[in-house]
Amino acid sequence: MRRRVALLGTSAFVVILLSFGLSVARPAAAGRSSDGAADTPTPAAYRDDLQRSYRTDHYLEVAESGVDRGENIYWHKCWACHNKYQQAAPTLEGLFKQPALITGVPVNEENVAAHIKKGGPGMPSFRTTLSDSDVADVVSYLHSEKCCVEGEHLPANPWYRSETNKWTVQNGLTGGANGTVRVASGDSPEGVMVQLIAPNGVRTTVYTNEDGKYEFPKMQAGAYILRIANPLEFKPYRRDSVQIDGPTKLEEIVLERIAKTRALPATPEVEAQLSGEEILWNLPGTVEEKEALHNTCALGCHSFQQIFKNRYDERSWGVLVARMLHRGGGPLINDPLEPVSDSALATDKLVTKWLARVRGPESVDGPMYAFPRLTGESNRVVVTEFELPRALQSAHDVYGDGNGNIWYTSHLSRFFGKLDTRTGVVTEYMAPLTPGAQPGTHHVYVEKNGEVLISEPWSHKLLKLDPRNGEMVEVPVAAPFPINSAGMADFDVTPDGFVLASMGGGYAAEKIDPKTGKMVQKYPMKVPFSYDGVVSQDGNFWAGGAISGTFGNSAELLDIRTGQMLNLDSGDRKSAGRRGGFDPFGNAWFGGENGTLVELDAKAKRIREFYPPGPVEPYTDLYSVEPDKNGEVWGGELHGREFLRFNPKTGQWTEYAMPEPYSHSRAVWVDKSTTPTTVWYADYSTGRIVRIQPME
């Protein structure tokens, strides 16, 4: 629930904490509190080193400077065009062993840095978006023996400590440390996120009620970091070595505002705490311009922040827009699968000119306005964030097994794994490599016998893993596209053990034998494909949504028993259902890329859409949703910070704010064995696994 505050309209963004000792923003009052925690003064710049979004925006996910930070920047800025799987640009491994650059000048650090800053045909100029120190770190990385990172290997995540610091992860809702938050100016303290970070790096966040009170679940006794997560309009607050033992009463937290009004300074620290939809809402521009961005750049491959943190000239934005929008598949490796239309080129031009205006070298942001904090039932929730062993992970799907583990995939690397939710310890696996294919996994499914099925979309394979012995078997699955364009990605499994999937251009749902990868039956449909396909809980039906993107309006319902396919559409309204699942009543639900929950009503044989609270498209869009055992539907805002819960019986929406300004969920898994419901997702922007536990 949101507080009813009017949104002020605008004309419309050393190794990471190898120990807990890095100096960051802390409470203003110096000294030692009654619970033994050390306080130090808050610096003038309101930066919180524990804010993951800030570290992501500033390429601090792996290290503070040097070769390792250069690797971090390379992954975000260079890898997409210079990876070894593509042919359009030179690979950069061994660059300093070459006599000359493609411009003909000698290869040395000065000339390489100059080329990065200037750019060239097909390459943006980085001089206005990377600092001199950023470029120096990239050059040091290119000069090192580590270059160049591919999906075959990723750097270690310095925040993953569950193997070295053994610590039990809480699983309850109440009974732990508690206290009160007060705002010095007298403003409401409701909806403030209070967080404890355990020695193993696992973060637990709870939320204040209208009196400013909060309560953690009972946690293992010991020393924790206490902080305010995503403080945004407040000065950062952090206390180290806070001793927790059962229902410890914590000292009152007093927060100070960074501004006297809702207008926040447009500093990097503030913008890093805004969600993508908040930044887009703040930026100048027409609805046409913002809708053009939404239709082309909001499909889930990255956050809005990954766009808006940059400053490029118009030529460079044009290079990037062309590269991002007209390559085949997620890795952007293959040439366009079909010629680019005149209308698409016109949209490219519109997006390029708008980005150059609002995110050009000379553009200056006005004051930034954040959406109001949530109230009421929205704050009755516990959110837990688990670290994974690799940085730059691109964590995609999650799925629970019968032993309390969560399996996850990695979209652009060979690494996938199993998270022990009781300890935070991850068992990591590496998918076999396919020559010439970008490694990466997409959907994961755990069968009743414990065997794990994982799709490898870029190499066109189905991976089968036996967790008991680690044995892996890969089965090729034919696809209508070349490798490095997506083959089978999303799939589900029928009661008799066959895989059902729909691949691009096939105009069908396909029944596939997982032992051989061969299609055994084809069910024609009227559209090229359904991005997702899910099997009903009774195993009698398969449902698919629309094609990928914002322009689809279709949904399909297959009676598996008879082979009859029902094709539906939402007319001129583009419902754009992406990923989803069945509720207990036989209806399929999908996340709509144009901002709605999309229901395929099986009995009425029609598509329905439900609009969440908050601003509509182009600001709000969904990607993946999943019903729970009660029929309530859960899904994350693709470019927001809220996770949504919808009760179709009552029409009630409940929003839950995440501790980072992302709810970047490519897939949702609902644990139907718990009461209340427990929801899991992999945050694609932070590379963490997130657990949501509502109190009701």
Q: Model-derived features: where do they sit?
A:
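Electrostatic cytochrome c docking/interface patches
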Residues: 35-73, 164-174, 201, 208, ...
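Gly/Gly-Pro-rich "capping" loops immediately C-terminal to redox-active cysteine motifs
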Residues: 64-71, 80-115, 302-329, 430-431
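The canonical Cys-X-X-Cys-His
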Residues: 70-85, 123, 138, 142, ...
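C-terminal capping alpha-helices of c-type cytochrome domains
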Residues: 127-159, 327-330, 335-367, 404-406, ...
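Structural motif
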Residues: 167-190
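Short, acidic Ser/Thr/Gly-rich low-complexity loop/linker segments typical of extracellular
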Residues: 197-213, 217
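A short, solvent-exposed loop/turn motif at the edges and junctions
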Residues: 199-201, 223, 227-242
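Blade-level signature of beta-propeller repeat domains, shared across WD40, Kelch, NHL, RCC1
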Residues: 663-696
